[in-house]
Amino acid sequence: MFWTFSFQGVTSLNFFARDYVNAPFNYTLFQSANPLYILLFAPLLALLWPWLSRRGRDPSTPRKFGIGILLVALSYGLVAAGIHFGTAADGKVGWWVLAGCYLLQTIGELALSPIGFGLVGLLAAKEETSFAMGGWFFGSALAYQLAGRIATLTTGSGTSAYSGIADYEHVYLWMFAAGTVVSLGYLLGAPQVRKLMHGVH
């Protein structure tokens, strides 16, 4: 789910930026937000996790997965709220809405992505490691496919700017709700999942 939602950054969010975001710069610059945020926040999280670990408060891997999904869900909640409450007379929202969306997604990615692939190698049986890693990449490919299908739902169905932007609001609100429910499942079920992880934190 995380990657399906995150991959909207190169699909529907890109078109949303082009058509419905009022920014003092070219909309293509939003594609630089994720790598810029990674450069800024990856060192901070690299310091945060060991700091929490020394105090016995480092979230377990299942909880980090839940945090990542929750943050990507909140990113679409932010966009939906920006559309609902912040659409100007020209039918566009402020650029800060999309900047905040990418920020939440990037922090979620940093919480989930670095440990996800490594976890496959740690938990898979030695003779099945290659197969398990292939499954990880297959999941990414499937996420791209689903992301494309979700992106098609955001295409404008009306003749005015407001009717078109409403499609984005509805889809992103649904993504916010679905992502929040799944993330809560991860967070609440983390203790049970950890028991199946053979001592891996």
Residue spans for each PLM region:
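Intrinsic disorder in cytosolic terminal tails and internal cytosolic loops
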Residues: 193-201
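Membrane-embedded alpha-helical bundles of multi-pass transporters/translocases
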Residues: 2-5, 12-16, 29-191
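Short, positively charged loop/turn segments that connect secondary-structure elements
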Residues: 25-27
